[in-house]
């Protein structure tokens, strides 16, 4: 079964983008390549349980087992050594990516208090969009009683778009609630 958002992309978004930017070839049309969700767990250096609960939260949210990220080098100010576990991340592609994006845009973000839309300034110049989330409770799968600590995460949308404008239009047509 094709995810709802992928169907919308194929039937509505591609024609809309071709009309707006005048692509000659269907392969030129930008598409979502992957979504990376990263959770930095600074407390993991003292308490291994924190990392385990972050990993379980992230696997529930993403529907896929995350990998534990380790420190690349030692930093005395942060009291971390090389190869110390300091967070976890998960990379979603294809079906899971579309399902997660659909859930994020239509269920999770509208549940945030005082939500007025996401910033349209968080593009990196190469057509990728980053979004910071303050708490994992906005996802319906996370049970409020089982949460030991409110954790934020970074969500990065990697697209094949060449420019920020193309990527913004792609995400807007897919249903990303931009503020302006």
From Swiss-Prot:
Pfam families: Ribosomal_L5 (PF00281), Ribosomal_L5_C (PF00673)
Name of the protein this chain belongs to: Large ribosomal subunit protein uL5
Binding partners and assembly: Part of the 50S ribosomal subunit; part of the 5S rRNA/L5/L18/L25 subcomplex. Contacts the 5S rRNA and the P site tRNA. Forms a bridge to the 30S subunit in the 70S ribosome.
MF terms in GO: rRNA binding; structural constituent of ribosome; tRNA binding
Family to which this protein belongs: Belongs to the universal ribosomal protein uL5 family.
A GO CC term attached to the entry: ribosome
Function according to Swiss-Prot or TrEMBL: This is one of the proteins that bind and probably mediate the attachment of the 5S RNA into the large ribosomal subunit, where it forms part of the central protuberance. In the 70S ribosome it contacts protein S13 of the 30S subunit (bridge B1b), connecting the 2 subunits; this bridge is implicated in subunit movement. Contacts the P site tRNA; the 5S rRNA and some of its associated proteins might help stabilize positioning of ribosome-bound tRNAs.
Organism of derivation: Clostridium tetani (strain Massachusetts / E88)
Gene: rplE
GO biological process, one term: translation
Protein keywords: Ribonucleoprotein, Ribosomal protein, RNA-binding, rRNA-binding, tRNA-binding
């Amino acid at each position: 079964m094709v995810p709802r958002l992928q169907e919308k992309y194929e039937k509505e978004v591609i024609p809309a983008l071709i009309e707006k930017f005048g692509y000659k070839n269907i392969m030129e049309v930008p598409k979502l390549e992957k979504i990376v969700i990263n959770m930095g767990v600074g407390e993991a250096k003292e308490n291994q349980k924190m990392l385990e609960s972050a990993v379980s939260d992230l696997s529930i949210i993403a529907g896929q087992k995350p990998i534990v990220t380790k420190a690349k080098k030692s930093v005395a100010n942060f009291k971390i050594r090389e190869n110390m576990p300091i967070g976890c991340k998960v990379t979603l592609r294809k079906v899971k990516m579309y399902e997660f994006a659909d859930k994020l845009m239509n269920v999770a973000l509208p549940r945030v208090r005082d939500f007025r839309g996401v910033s349209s300034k968080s593009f990196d110049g190469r057509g990728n969009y980053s979004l910071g989330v303050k708490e994992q409770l906005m996802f319906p799968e996370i049970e409020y009683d089982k949460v030991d600590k409110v954790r934020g995460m970074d969500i990065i949308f990697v697209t094949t778009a060449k420019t920020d404008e193309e990527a913004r239009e792609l995400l807007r047509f897919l249903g990303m609630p931009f503020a302006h």
